[in-house]
Structures are given as C-alpha cells and as structure tokens.
Amino acid sequence: MSGPSDYQPSNPALQWIERRLPILGLMHSSFVAYPTPRNLNYWWTFGAILSFMLGMQILTGVILAMHYTPHADLAFKSVELIVRDVNYGWLLRNMHACGASMFFFAVYVHMLRGLYYGSYKEPREVLWILGVIIYLLMMATGFMGYVLPWGQMSFWGATVITNLFSAIPYFGESIVTLLWGGYSVGNPTLNRFFSLHYLLPFLIAGVVVLHVWALHVAGQNNPEGVEPKSEKDTVPFTPHATIKDMFGVACFLLLYAWFIFYMPNYLGDADNYIPANPGVTPPHIVPEWYYLPFYAILRSIPNKLAGVIGMFSAIIILCFLPWLDAAKTRSSKYRPLAKQFFWIFVAVCILLGYLGAQPPEGIYVIAGRVLTVCYFAYFLIVLPLLSRIETPRPVPNSISEAILAKGGKAVASVAIALVAAGALFLGSLQDARANEGSDKPPGNKWSFAGPFGKFDRGALQRGLKVYKEVCASCHGLSYIAFRNLAEAGGPSYSVAQVAAFASDYKIKDGPNDAGDMFERPGRPADYFPSPFPNEQAARAANGGAAPPDLSLITKARSYGRGFPWFIFDFFTQYQEQGPDYVSAVLQGFEEKVPEGVTIPEGSYYNKYFPGHAIKMPKPLSDGQVTYDDGSPATVAQYSKDVTTFLMWTAEPHMEARKRLGFQVFVFLIIFAGLMYFTKKKVWADSH
C-alpha cells in the first residue's frame, strides 16, 4: 500500500513466495518500514484500537452465530442458552455486546480527533470519505445486531426505525415491506437482519482495507498539521508506532474488561431481557446510546420526512467537510476560534445525546430543535465563515521543530473531560429508562455485589424454598434446569439432592409408543416446568394478566438512579438495580390506598410498582415459609432470599465472570506495564 518494496526475506522458501506473490514486501513496506510522523499522540492509537475491535467483533460474532437460532420463536431463548449452556458463552456474549459500545466509543474519538486536527483536508479527502462510509456501515450493522436478541427493545426498535423508510415518497411503503418481509416486523425481518448482520462486518473489513490503503497513499496527518519534510520528522512504524499502539490497546482493554466482567449490563436496556411482545409497547423506546444524537435530531423535526432527511443529513454532511472547511491551516491547535467552536460542537453532540434519551415532550423538544440548528450551523455556517475570517497562529516549519515544545497536560485534561462527558451522557440514558410514577427502591447489601461478591449459599437454598412454596404456583423458571442446582456458583446441592428434588415434579413427556403424551417424574436434565400449559391458560387463571417467567426477572426490571449516582455506579460497579427493585416490590404492598391515589378495580396498591397499581396480590406474609436454619420467617427475609435466588437464575455464571475478570485485570495491568516501559526504551533515542 505504500508503494514498491525492495524487501527480500532471508528464508529461501519465503524468497520463492516473494518472487511470485510479493505479499511479505507489501506487509513490510506498510507496517514495518512505513514512515510515521514522530509527533503522533495517543489519539492516533484509536486507529489500532478500532482494528483490534473490528477483529474481535467478527471473531465473537462468528462463534455466536454457530449457536444462535434466527427464528422469532427461538431467538430469545437461543441467546439465553448460549449464555447458560455454551462453554464461556456468557463471555462471548458480553464481549460482543459490550464490544459494540466500545467500538462506537473508539470510532467517535477517532472521528473527533480527525475533526480537531483537520485530517479531512487535502490530500486526505478520500481517506475521510471512506471513514464516513465505514461509520454508516457500522451504524447499520449495530442496529441489525441489536434486533437479534429479539427482546422488547429489539422488536420495538426495529419497528420504529424501519418505519422511518415509509416517509420516502412513492417507494417508502415498498421499502418497509421489503425490510419486514411482510406487513409487520416478524420472523422474515429477523432472518433478513441476521443475514445482513453477518455479512456487513466483512464489508466493513473490506472498506477498512481501502481506508488503510488511502492512508498509506496520502500519509498520516499529525497534531501539527504539517507534512514531514525530512527523515528527522518520521520514525519507522515498527517498532515505534507498533509498541505505542500496543500500550494504548492494553489500556483500552482495561476499560473494555471493566464492562465485560463487572458492568456487562450497564450500557444495555432492562426491557431487552423481556421476550419480544408485539402487544405490549415499552414506556420509552430508546435506541442504543451511540445513536441518540441522531435520534434526537429525528424527533426534533415535526414532519416525518423532514426528520428522516435531517437524521441522515447529519451523517452525510461529514462527507462534504473537506470542502466546507476551506482553511489552509489544518490543526485546530493553531486556530483559536476553530478550537473554541469545536468544543462547542462536542457539547452540542453530547446534549443531543441527552435529549435523545428523554421523552419527546415539552422543553426537550424545543431544546432538541435549537441544538439541531446548532449542529448543522457548525458545518454550514461556522466552518465556511471561519475559513475566511480567522487568522491562525504561526505553524511550525517542521514536525521536529514542534516536538521541542510538546506538552501532555492538555491531552490529559481532554481525556478527563471526555470521561466526565461520557458518564453524564450514559447517566441521562439511565434516567430515561427509569420506572415512572413510583418511589425509588431502597438499597440493599447483597452478598453478590461488587468485584469480589459471591452468592450466599444459605440464601440461595432458602430462596429456592420460597420460590417452590410460594412463587411456583404462578411463575415458571423456564431457563433453569434442575442440574443447574448442583453446579459451581449455585445453591451447592449434591447430585443426589438434585435428583430427589427433580423427582418431586411431574414432567409432561411423549409421545409414547401408543402416540400418547404422559407424565413422569422429573430428572436432573429437565427444566423447571411452567405452572400453566400456555399463556392463555395463565391469563385465564390470573384475571387477564400473564405472570412473567422469573428466570430473568432481576435483569428485566430496573429503575433510573439519577444524578449523580449513575456516575458513582460506574466506578463502584453498582449493578443491583434489578434485585433492589424486585425486593422492594415484594415488600411494597400496602392494604390501605393513600388518599388522592386511585387504582383500577381488581388491582393492589404497591408503592414501588410503576403507577402503584399491580394485578398480583401480596405474595408474602410473615410465617408463610418455615426455614430449617433458624433464619427469621419475615417478609423482609423472604424477599431478600428469593431475590438472591432469582439473581442467580438470571446469571448462574456470575461468580465465574468476576473470578475470571480479576485474573484478566491482573494480566492486562502487567501487560500494559511491560508495554509502557518497552515504549519508553524504544522511543528513548527518538526524542
């Protein structure tokens, strides 16, 4: 990609290959001898991070696809079975799901770095446009991937976003029908999205090759925005840039691992742990955080077609940036006004993301319209105007001259600002997903909380007893097999105890030789049976409300923590919104409805349930279940024990996740330290 190479391998076999297919020379000229500006800072490391993350997403995605079932009736269950029954399936899913967010985080940093340092200017226009194409492909891939788990937010997100194409005149309805494969989102839609989600990453990889090719033709930009003029301005890509990139990737992996092992659901949505239900619309349909700024632009424009045009224009306009900004000076380091407006633009994007997570009503709509105007004004008014009126500061004559005055404090402060802004952004997302119209649940001290938390075996066994004697008459545990009770990290029953426990249940099986269905005693390999044969029977027995399956209830329920707790949650690894909520609801029943509160007939008042009206009668009362270990037979103890058990049913491999996370963190810290000191040694003679 860097041009002809005179590299010749010393090995005779490799020489034979090189004469016929000079692939080794191409690799040497592109990734070893390639001259790299010596003043590149760590913002340039995100290119290597993105390459690593793309490879990681493709690898984990291919393995997950081996076990995934793209069928509307089986997709949700297949994902859960991957997590529970495939060896390290929980790790693969966490890597892939959290990896999508990390991929977008890295690409946003990469794009903002290009904006700040003018990496879109001549001669890098094609390089920049290819980057925008990659970003568009990433957005399409991420959206289709989010649909695949077939949870509530997946289904309704697909419905809302695909419906946008109906705004296109003449062809819109036909496009929507083609995407759906029918007249509503369903199984054909899921199959289409799975196929495209599998294909697009390889297309992204192909465009990345073109992107890297264009980079090697035009050369890398640098913080000063001046082209290398002599050998003193550059260093060989390997080992200098390679080692620096490896250190940067190692540091990024620490953040990545933080989410994988300790905060896997921090960036997700509780509603997506509920199977897709076309008959129940979520209170807030909110896309993933990396789409929120554009979602805010879409919703801020009242006309549907204009909103769609505005949303796509907000991305496409990036392709025209090389011609909108005609300033001769590339880097904003030497453009005081451009630097100020750049940070204003970053603030506008963050605020748009905040608004995208809020309900489309009142002041949020007005603010969205103002910020949408600001977003487009930056590209269409500010940049063209600045290129004509701004007087830049003197630019260094060469890269080597600029290195003498280099400092790192600004980079550190910008990094801190980005982390703080990102925390605020993610916190706004949690606020939007709060349970409205109810008191916030009180916190609890859970044994499984924190990086070294473990399940209390006694609480798990007591919780199972409460479930069996109280909850099992209405609620199933369809994702838990009896054998799971004997697995490490669970209630710690012996194989014999599990067999005896399973035999108490009657399992419908068959057909037998006569073609009839029959009942038999349960076996360890069987799953907990549902108390009802189907959903219609469940509704008929419960006044029209279908009791939810409890396997995932502590993940499928949550509440917004609000400011500033969501910031602290990231650092304290607080992930117990679900258990706190479930425990609070079990204890939140009150016989007397407060004055001024009206609930429908046949409902019960619960101060923690959204809207306070719940169809489920009070399930627990003091003395209802007898414990053999002397634990108090109170509602508070029952609720805490059964919630602990339900947290285990939601994630049986939690202890393994945290244990492996500690080992990975130790390795990454040591690896990052080795890379840092190696980098110091390699670069010692280059400054």
Swiss-Prot record:
Heme b b562 binds at residues 96, 197. InterPro entries: Cyt_b/b6_C, Cyt_b/b6_C_sf, Cyt_b/b6_N, Cyt_c-like_dom, Cyt_c-like_dom_sf, Cyt_c1, Cytb/b6-like_sf, Cytochrome_b_C_euk/bac. The protein is post-translationally processed into cytochrome b and c1. This occurs by processing between residues 434 and 435 without processing between cytochrome b and the N-terminal of the putative signal sequence domain. One of its GO terms (cellular component) is membrane. Residues 404-434 are annotated as: Internal signal sequence. This is Cytochrome b/c1. It comes from Bradyrhizobium diazoefficiens (strain JCM 10833 / BCRC 13528 / IAM 13628 / NBRC 14792 / USDA 110). GO terms for molecular function: electron transfer activity; heme binding; metal ion binding; oxidoreductase activity. It is found in: Cell inner membrane. GO terms for biological process: proton transmembrane transport; respiratory electron transport chain. The main subunits of complex b-c1 are: cytochrome b, cytochrome c1 and the Rieske protein. Residues 458-643 form the Cytochrome c domain. Keywords: Cell inner membrane, Cell membrane, Electron transport, Heme, Iron, Membrane, Metal-binding, Respiratory chain, Transmembrane, Transmembrane helix, Transport. PROSITE patterns: CYTB_CTER, CYTB_NTER, CYTC. Binds 2 heme b groups non-covalently. Heme 1 (or bL or b562) is low-potential and absorbs at about 562 nm, and heme 2 (or bH or b566) is high-potential and absorbs at about 566 nm. Its cofactor is heme b; heme c. PANTHER family: CYTOCHROME B. Component of the ubiquinol-cytochrome c reductase complex (complex III or cytochrome b-c1 complex), which is a respiratory chain that generates an electrochemical potential coupled to ATP synthesis. c1 functions as an electron donor to cytochrome c. Heme b b566 binds at residues 110, 211.
